[in-house]
């Protein structure tokens, strides 16, 4: 009887502490049409049953607002309840629409109650707002952003709203580029959040040597820089990926083979170890953007475009994950910004022409441009010492390349534009152990889980 209880306890620890693994989901399709609840349900079901995987059961959203409405909760919420898919919520903080985002959050809490609350693993307040508000972001028309003071105020407001509700223990974070996180003027945001969201795209680091063979080192370097300023708080990987098709960015070639390599070398070590939201399940419905990051094509199918299986050799060892749990926590991604404006209802981002009830911005880091437009690609810190990358756009606006800025050692992978069907990613990780446990577990506790399992089975061996 004692043995049975010990084994059950060990297994419950392993189950409860598993890292979240999912995709980013925009509020609209690639043609700008608004997604319905059934659309989200189909996507969530497909993600859970992808051939070669154990299932991607979490979804990162860019906005709380359903497309075509002023402040009604996004239909991804009832879809997630129906499909038992966990949620990393996103509130678009720039452009003057925060009041409507907060109204939608309040409505979701009252309308869906505990069935909704139990699925929420985190809340991201804004995405890449700090980058867009920077001088470098303004130079490339990255879109409307906000500074650290306003962002901290919004974070406090969200904490106040969820206090005393079923979401009171949910960790709150913000998603931005590593250059924004490492800019000392933004340190107040790090102090205000429970976790930091990171997005990184080596493919778009076109001012550097960014071939697929360099991708893992570029990604790891940018994550390390973010963790170095995180003050011990978790970094969640909220957005990263490699395109299956599209234009070439310096040495970065979009192809199925390279997307598979990036999945193996960057994704597989993260999955089940670090909270990770990949970019993206599908971005080619009904039109295919340039570049396209979807692991499935224009037709939603559980059969992916390339092999998604992860061999044991691509995963960190149990001892490595336990000893490096703090450094291996996922990093988040950031919200859209770039050359093409998107509608938040579809991607979580909206153009300046869209009412302030939906986020307004253009494609930039961490965001995929709508349709064929590409993001303003992020590269490295500017030569002037600014922590923000410089970008130049092509005349067509369909693609952009970053200007040379900073040495390669100062550069790390960041984000890029995405299709309008997706919105910019946000991410986070709970820093406090209480927050982590409250949300069902995070990568930082993987070491303690492993230790508990070892202790239990060692004890069993003595019986």
From Swiss-Prot:
Which EC number(s) does UniProt give? Answer: 3.2.1.39
Listed under catalytic activity are: Hydrolysis of (1->3)-beta-D-glucosidic linkages in (1->3)-beta-D-glucans
Identify where the record puts lipid attachment of type GPI-anchor amidated glycine.
440
> In its UniProt record, which GO terms are filed under biological process?
cell wall organization; polysaccharide catabolic process
Q: Which UniProt keywords apply?
A: Carbohydrate metabolism, Cell membrane, Cell wall, Cell wall biogenesis/degradation, Glycoprotein, GPI-anchor, Hydrolase, Lipoprotein, Membrane, Polysaccharide degradation, Secreted, Signal
Coiled-coil residue windows: none
**Glycans attached where?**
84, 183, 312
Give the chief site where it resides: membrane
Its membrane topology: Lipid-anchor; GPI-anchor
Which molecular-function annotation in GO is an example for this chain?
glucan endo-1,3-beta-D-glucosidase activity
Signal peptide per UniProt: 1-18
Question: What post-translational modification does the entry describe?
Answer: The GPI-anchor is attached to the protein in the endoplasmic reticulum and serves to target the protein to the cell surface. There, the glucosamine-inositol phospholipid moiety is cleaved off and the GPI-modified mannoprotein is covalently attached via its lipidless GPI glycan remnant to the 1,6-beta-glucan of the outer cell wall layer.
Q: Which InterPro entries match?
A: Beta-glucan_modifiers (IPR050732), Glyco_hydro_17 (IPR000490), Glycoside_hydrolase_SF (IPR017853)
Any chance you could tell me the propeptide residue ranges? 441-463
Enzyme class, UniProt record, top EC level: hydrolase
Q: Does the keyword Signal apply?
A: yes
Record localization: Cell membrane; Secreted, Cell wall
Sequence segments annotated as region (Disordered): 317-354, 396-430
Write out the catalytic residues in the record: 128 (proton donor), 239 (nucleophile)
GO CC, sorted alphabetically, is:
cell surface; extracellular region; fungal-type cell wall; plasma membrane; side of membrane
Function according to Swiss-Prot or TrEMBL: Glucanases play a role in cell expansion during growth, in cell-cell fusion during mating, and in spore release during sporulation. This enzyme may be involved in beta-glucan degradation and also function biosynthetically as a transglycosylase.
In the record, the note on similarity to other proteins reads: Belongs to the glycosyl hydrolase 17 family.
Q: What is this protein called?
A: Probable glucan endo-1,3-beta-glucosidase eglC
Q: Which gene encodes it?
A: eglC
